[in-house]
Amino acid sequence: MSTREEVVVTGLGVVSPIGIGVDAFQESLHAERSGIRRLTLLDPSLLPVQFGGEVVDFEPKQYVRPRKSLKVMSRDIQIAFSAADQALIQAGVSAGTIDGERFGVVFGSDLIQPDPEETYLAYRACLTDDGFDFSRWGEASQTDIYPLWMLKHLPNMPACHIGIAFDARGPNNTVTLGEVSSHAAMAEAVRLIERGWADIVLTGGTGTRVHPTWIVRNSVTEVSHRNESPEHAARPFEAGRDGEVFGEGAAATVLESRTAAKRRGAKILARAAGFGSAFGRATDGGVTQAAIEQSIVGALRDAGLGADEVGFVAAFGRGTRTADEIEARAIRAVLGDVPVTVPKSFYGNLGSGGGAVDVVATVMMLQTHQIVPTLNYEQSDPACPVNVVARAQKLAKPVALVLSQTPMGQAAAVCLIGEA
């Protein structure tokens, strides 16, 4: 029997294509409302993919403080800060109410894409009739790019800004590992508490893939091109799927020891019970079935649970032909006919923010005892032998697994247990 301290969830925050804040987010999930739409924050007419999961009506001045920090905050940082603020408010944590030296931050982040207009003048100054003259870049970058530009795009900035603003003077770390960043960050946050290095840790992830540079660079990969019907583009495990859908978003989770939560009188939302990770890259790219299986088995072992105790899986569901087949076979091999849903069918692949948003969705399903459906699942694919939830259904067992993976071969799983 394990004697380690249980780690619980006491606060959630989310900025997503289906809502800003947990109430709006949950309402959209239950209303089965897609957040995939034609892009509006940039002119998509010249882009090969003109839609995605975009966060609309986000006003950073409502959340970011001090306001002057906005000058050195990219959109990824802004939405991360907002999600963190929401989570801490829900958990009842504020500066002065806890020991700052026992308060940590571990966040997942992508390599943050710069906006083209930020480097346009410097780039143009280097153009010649023969192409790009690299010898001019040193001078042009010094004169035509904002001096603090780099601070807007370092992946550790979300954790830094959050730590400074909320007086979190304990362990502070950033994980940059593609789509599994949030999972790895959450695992590290739990270990900090279990090792006794912190009482409370804010964890989460942030990312955007509806960025023009990202879209252009990745549009030649297996990406859905349903520009005429974007709300039907995200179709994980479905027979008619034609590629993944990009999105943007951030989420944050407040974790603390059960002892600390009870001492504060905090409401416990769920338990962060186990984590598993593995690596295996297929010869033709993508993660291997064995790696996904290993991550699932590892998370269950860490939680001290058996496969028959899992109530549902929040699958990664990339939406490509091969990736979905591999993930489906792995789930079937370890967990049998367990119900499977894909939250990202609502908002797309959010990069390093996706796992954190999936965790928020999963905690909500555990709280409401209801599994939300996978949108656009109309026709099953025999090559994906999983029990996909196409219509909302009651949750029979209060245990969930949240899966993630990267095209480079990383696989990760988080095990969450609902609170009675």
Residue ranges of each PLM-predicted region?
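Conserved beta-ketoacyl condensing-enzyme motif
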Residues: 9, 24, 30-166, 170-172, ...
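A glycine- and small-aliphatic-rich helix-loop capping segment at beta-alpha/alpha-beta transitions
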Residues: 23-28, 114-131, 193-194, 215-228, ...
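Active-site-proximal alpha-helical scaffold in enzymes
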Residues: 80-93, 155-168, 172-207, 245-266, ...
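Acyl-CoA/ACP chain-elongation machinery
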Residues: 197-242, 275-289, 315-325, 338-386
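Glycine-/small-residue-rich "gating" segment that lines the acyl/pantetheine channel
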Residues: 127-145, 187, 191-195, 206-262, ...
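Cysteine-centered functional microenvironments
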Residues: 8, 12-13, 63-73, 137-149, ...
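Condensing-enzyme catalytic core mediating Claisen C-C bond formation in acyl metabolism
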Residues: 6-10, 33-38, 229-305, 311-312, ...
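ACP-dependent fatty acid/polyketide chain-elongation machinery
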Residues: 1-69, 91, 259-273, 360-374, ...
